[in-house]
Curated annotation (Swiss-Prot):
Compositional bias ranges of the Basic and acidic residues kind: 250-261, 309-318
Name of the protein this chain belongs to: Pheromone-regulated membrane protein 5
Placement of covalent cross-link Glycyl lysine isopeptide (Lys-Gly) (interchain with G-Cter in ubiquitin): K314
Subcellular location: Membrane
Swiss-Prot/TrEMBL keywords: Isopeptide bond, Membrane, Phosphoprotein, Transmembrane, Transmembrane helix, Ubl conjugation
Region Disordered: start-end pairs: 238-318
Transmembrane segments: 78-98
Similarity comment: Belongs to the PRM5 family.
Lineage, broadest ranks: Eukaryota, Fungi, Dikarya, Ascomycota, Saccharomycotina
Residue ranges with Polar residues bias: 276-285
GO CC entries: cellular bud neck; fungal-type vacuole; membrane
Mode of membrane association: Single-pass membrane protein
Residues with PTM Phosphoserine: S129, S279, S282, S288
Comp. bias (Low complexity): 238-247
Length: 318
């Protein structure tokens, strides 16, 4: 069994002391002593305080050293300077956008113009040009076809000669795709590059040969109808008939075959009819009679001369 004993306590006593110092400090001490005796605990408390004066700015009235801002808000100078700088920056940005757009537009228009003017599709090797005033077909037919009423027996050779010249002049702009240049560097019209292809001219002539072989419609044009019950269906047959009348019977077959094979003559100019002794006599007779099919021998140019002609843009005669 546990016995609890409660001791009596007296009321505490409060002791107060006040002191003033330069530092503000406050401390309160309460001491309580519990003992079996009847003495009461003691409580001690100390308080310190200090006075700080307030700072008052000087008045602007009558003071020349203080700027009077008046009614303007604070930061007016910053706002003005920032606005001017912003306007200048926006003006520069707007000018850059306008000039860039105009330059791109001008460049695009110039490129389109150059692509249309200097593209290979508008050259003489690609058929009709959009800048021509008349179609190529009508020009070809008008200059090559000859009516019978305009031809008399006396000037038959002259008419055939005119037809041949007209056909040769109109043949070059209206060739098919076989006569297209191999490359812009190999083209005769391009003199901006020093590149010279040693095989470009040979391949170009080969394409010309294929043109004559695969496009006979350029040569098979009705030209005239003779009064001797002999119908001529093409320019080649007309030339053959006019030339055959002025040749001997022994040389008629040989000359006719050479006329009907222009590809071999164009592709290999060194193979002439003058290689055989029989053809020498026929050529002399043809030259004396004014025949159109006289094949004259010509010395082949030296390589240096050939290169000079190519650089100067001169056409090589076949």
């Amino acid at each position: 069994m546990t016995v609890i004993t409660i001791a009596k306590r007296g009321l505490p006593k409060l002791t107060t002391s006040t002191s003033s110092t330069t530092t503000a400090s406050s401390s309160s001490t309460i001491t309580s002593v519990a003992s079996s005796s009847s003495s009461l605990p003691l409580l001690s408390n100390s308080t310190s305080s200090s006075i700080i004066p307030s700072i008052t700015p000087p008045s602007r009235n009558g003071n020349p050293y203080i700027l009077d801002s008046g009614d303007m808000p604070n930061g007016t100078v910053f706002i003005v300077v920032g606005g001017i700088a912003g306007v200048i920056f926006l003006a520069i940005l707007l000018w850059w956008v306008i000039t860039t757009y105009s330059s791109h537009r001008l460049t695009r228009s110039v490129q389109d113009y150059e692509s249309k003017m200097f593209s290979t599709q508008h050259t003489q090797f690609y058929g009709d040009s959009p800048y021509m005033d008349y179609p190529a077909k009508e020009n070809f037919q008008d200059q090559v076809h000859i009516s019978e009423s305009d031809i008399s027996p006396g000037n038959k050779d002259e008419s055939v000669k005119d037809a041949l010249v007209s056909h040769t002049n109109n043949e070059k702009p209206f060739l098919s795709n076989f006569e297209r240049p191999l490359s812009s560097l190999v083209s005769e019209s391009n003199r901006n590059s020093l590149f010279i292809s040693p095989t470009g001219d040979i391949l170009y002539k080969t394409r010309l040969s294929k043109l004559y072989q695969e496009s006979p419609r350029l040569l098979q044009k009705p030209v005239i109808m003779t009064s001797d019950n002999v119908s001529t269906n093409s320019l080649v047959s007309t030339i053959s008939s006019s030339s055959a009348s002025s040749l001997d019977n022994g040389n008629e077959k040989e000359v006719g075959e050479d006329i009907r094979k222009p590809a071999k003559i164009a592709s290999s100019p060194s193979r002439k009819l003058l290689n055989s002794p029989e053809s020498d006599g026929s050529v002399n007779r043809n030259h004396s009679k004014g025949n159109l099919l006289v094949v004259q021998s010509k010395r082949k140019p030296t390589p240096s001369t050939y290169l000079e002609h190519m650089l100067e843009g001169k056409e090589q005669d076949e």
